[in-house]
Amino acid sequence: MAKEFSRTRRIAQQLQQELAMVLQRDMKDPRIGFVTVNDVDVSRDLSYAKVYVTFFEEDTELVQQKIDALTVAAPYVRTLVAGRMKLRVMPELRFIYDSSLVEGMRMSNLVTQVINKDKAKQQQFTPDTPDNSESVDGEKEQD
């Protein structure tokens, strides 16, 4: 049986798609730049929507400037999205920076560094002599 999705989840998914389209095509503000909409959480009464976004920049000052620009543009974005969606109540948009992507990349780099260090230590302490298993097998064949 297929998993059922609640109405708020379906609206959140559609809102995410529409926001991505509007931010990519209709927003001309150079302060915002390239924005990725990662997730949208809509309140049960559809009055608020938390929009989780990421940017290419990792500098916290630039990220905060972009979030501020999105916050100022939120009523305009809300109007554009409302024209695309058929909802009685269009949620108020709250833009939030999603740092999970940056944190995930940082964690992945740390794991890679640890693996490389372990390989280097293993190669350092492993002798360069050939395995004794071949000579043992060879002796058994001679018997």
Curated annotation (Swiss-Prot):
TM region positions: none
Primary site of residence: cytoplasm
Location within or outside the cell: Cytoplasm
GO terms under cellular component: cytosol
SUPFAM superfamilies: Ribosome-binding factor A, RbfA
InterPro entries on file: KH_dom-like_a/b, RbfA, RbfA_dom_sf, Ribosome-bd_factorA_CS
PROSITE patterns named among the record's database cross-references: RBFA
Coiled coil (residue ranges): none
A GO biological-process term: maturation of SSU-rRNA
GO molecular function: ribosomal small subunit binding
Keywords from the UniProt entry: Cytoplasm, Ribosome biogenesis
UniProt KW NADP keyword: no
Region of interest: Disordered: 119-143
Domain of life: Bacteria
Sequence ranges of Polar residues compositional bias: 122-133
Stated family: Belongs to the RbfA family.
Subunit structure: Monomer. Binds 30S ribosomal subunits, but not 50S ribosomal subunits or 70S ribosomes.
Protein purpose: One of several proteins that assist in the late maturation steps of the functional core of the 30S ribosomal subunit. Associates with free 30S ribosomal subunits (but not with 30S subunits that are part of 70S ribosomes or polysomes). Required for efficient processing of 16S rRNA. May interact with the 5'-terminal helix region of 16S rRNA.
Official protein name in the record: Ribosome-binding factor A
Source organism: Shewanella frigidimarina (strain NCIMB 400)
